[in-house]
A protein has these predicted regions:
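Beta-strand-loop-alpha-helix segment that lines the small-molecule cofactor/substrate pocket
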Residues: 132-174
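Extracytoplasmic/secreted proteins, especially bacterial periplasmic and envelope-associated proteins
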Residues: 58, 81-85, 114, 130-134, ...
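N-terminal secretory signal peptides and thylakoid transit peptides that target proteins
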Residues: 4-25
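N-terminal Rossmann-like dinucleotide-binding module
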Residues: 24-95
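A structured beta-alpha segment of the ubiquitous adenosine-cofactor-binding alpha/beta core
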Residues: 94-124
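Rossmann-like NAD(P)-binding element
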Residues: 114-133, 146, 153
């Protein structure tokens, strides 16, 4: 039996495949987050953004579009102008779901604490070197975590994340 490759015109491009895979992953993530939050007895799912660039904003936009029970509780970015721009965007586009206060809309490197505290789930899409640190802080606080790729930038970070996954399982936030 000979397997042939379909002509390139019928094969999806690598870009198209990755886009469709990302949408599928986000959908599964959204469903599992919704189920776990509702199973815990909470009516609303509060999300927080660590990073206000295109990827984190896109993930937050998608999560908020899942339904009125998803609320944006906080956002942080190193650059204040970027955070303010996204804050204004989400306030306008999702007025009933934007519940972030001035204390949970922060800039700089220390603002992550207020965002994690205010959230049930944290979207991490910022400079890759901070992914592991922010994920550790969120899981230790008992929060669900979504991290953009790359999850870690070196082998030590990968090992820390692997151990963090075990902690997340114990805390039932995986």
């Amino acid at each position: 039996m000979t397997l042939s490759t379909p002509p390139s015109s019928t094969r999806p491009s690598r870009r198209k495949f990755l886009q469709q895979s990302a949408v599928g992953t986000a959908t599964v993530y959204g469903l599992s987050l919704e189920r776990s939050a509702h199973a815990a007895g909470s009516a609303a799912i509060k999300i927080g953004m660590l990073g206000c660039g295109g990827r984190c904003s896109g993930a937050a936009n998608y999560a908020l579009s899942l339904g009125k029970d998803v609320k944006l509780a906080g956002m942080m970015d190193v650059f204040q102008d970027r955070m303010l721009e996204k804050r204004d965007f989400f306030r306008k586009e999702f007025p009933d779901q934007f519940i972030a206060s001035d204390e949970t809309c922060t800039s700089g490197l220390e603002g992550y604490k207020a965002v994690i505290e205010a959230s049930d789930a944290v979207l991490i899409a910022c400079a890759s070197k901070y992914h592991v640190f922010y994920a550790e802080e969120a899981v230790k606080a008992g929060k669900h975590v979504f991290i953009e790729k790359p999850h870690a930038i070196d082998p030590a970070g990968c090992h820390r994340l692997r151990r963090l996954c075990e902690l997340a399982k114990k805390k039932n936030v995986c």
